[in-house]
A protein has these predicted regions:
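Aromatic- and acidic-residue-enriched segments that line the glycan-binding/catalytic groove
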Residues: 32-38, 51, 62-86, 136-141, ...
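The substrate-binding groove and active-site-proximal loops of carbohydrate-active enzymes
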Residues: 1, 24-41, 78-97, 121-132, ...
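An active-site-proximal structural segment forming one wall of the substrate-binding cleft
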Residues: 38-58, 80-117
Length: 308
């Protein structure tokens, strides 16, 4: 399958873990009707990754961002009188109900049950949106009550303000940062935040942005492959990273999201090629081979193979 080939190409690069978001609005398009079939078969995705020798990281909503329609929240929530991404019980009851269907698909695949899922994310970059810790704690509680007993984590921009607002460091939830360059500076900021809270935690970039998304009426954004390889090398000498994206693919239908700048809407294009190491069709690019060369030179202990 295409999924198998793409995961194989990640393994071939010398990486050991695959990460995925879980878009609520695809799994519960219509209220109360769930779909985990075909390309939405999360269990199959995790089993496939494990069969290839890959660990997995799961980021299961409620909100995922990802330049995805409504950040992954189902459109039918807009017909409800509720405040999203908050402790509003009218919102959280739907999160809880969704988790009761979703989490049993993840729990058997946790490393604690012989599976490959290492970590699970609480919300997503909440520090860029709000600072209601009670909401984050409630999401954490629902994950734990649903049987998630691997490390939970948050991910936010690596700045003190966003880390303060979006992390649950005082609840011992692992804190990760999202950035695409200047690893030394960004990891130093994170280390400072950890130290201020009495933590000696490892440093991890949960989204190392290797390309960028594209909006209508704006030029296509490209990143030099060798410059990226150098930036990844710098990051890996200090901490761990998850490439965002390794493969971007396509926003089919109306799933392309829309951000805003002031009062101006900034809709995404249909393609989510992202100038990633695998192109929209899933083929290795120059960026892939630049990363592969860098990995072979600097991390020879990570076994590589020829890509498909």
């Amino acid at each position: 399958s295409e999924m198998c080939i793409r995961d194989s190409n990640l393994k071939a690069l010398g990486f050991n873990t695959v990460e995925t978001y879980v878009p609520w609005n695809l799994h519960e398009k219509e209220e109360g009707t769930y779909d985990f079939s075909k390309i939405l078969d999360l269990s199959h995705f995790l089993e496939l990754a494990q069969s290839l020798g890959l660990y997995a990281i799961v980021r299961p909503a409620p909100y995922i961002c990802a330049e995805w329609e409504f950040g992954g929240l189902p459109a039918w929530l807009l017909t409800k009188e509720c405040r999203i991404r908050s402790t509003d019980p009218r919102f959280m009851k739907y999160v809880k109900r969704y988790y009761q269907t979703l989490l049993p698909k993840i729990v058997p695949h946790l490393v604690t049950h012989g599976g490959n899922v290492l970590m699970v994310q609480v919300e997503n970059e909440y520090g860029s949106y709000g600072e209601e810790k009670a909401y984050l704690r409630q999401v954490k509680k629902y994950l734990e009550e649903g049987g998630i007993n691997v490390p939970l984590f948050t991910s936010d921009g690596p700045w003190q303000a966003t880390l303060r607002a979006g992390s649950l460091i005082d609840d011992d939830v692992f804190t990760t940062g999202n950035f695409g360059s200047k690893a030394k500076e960004n990891f130093a900021d994170m280390a400072q935040f950890f130290e201020a809270h009495g933590k000696k935690w490892p440093l991890m970039c949960m989204e190392f942005w290797d390309g960028w998304f594209n909006r209508w009426k704006e030029p296509i954004i490209k990143r030099d492959p060798e410059e990226l390889a150098d930036a990844v090398k710098e990051a890996l000498q200090i901490g761990s990273i998850n490439l965002y994206m390794f493969h971007g693919g396509t926003n089919f239908g109306f799933m392309n999201g829309c951000s805003a700048r002031g009062t101006i809407d900034l809709p995404q294009v249909t393609s989510y090629d992202y100038d990633a190491p695998l192109d929209e069709q899933g083929n290795p690019t120059e960026k892939y081979f630049a990363l592969k060369r860098m990995m072979a030179e600097n991390f020879p202990e990570m076994q590589q193979m020829e890509p498909w």
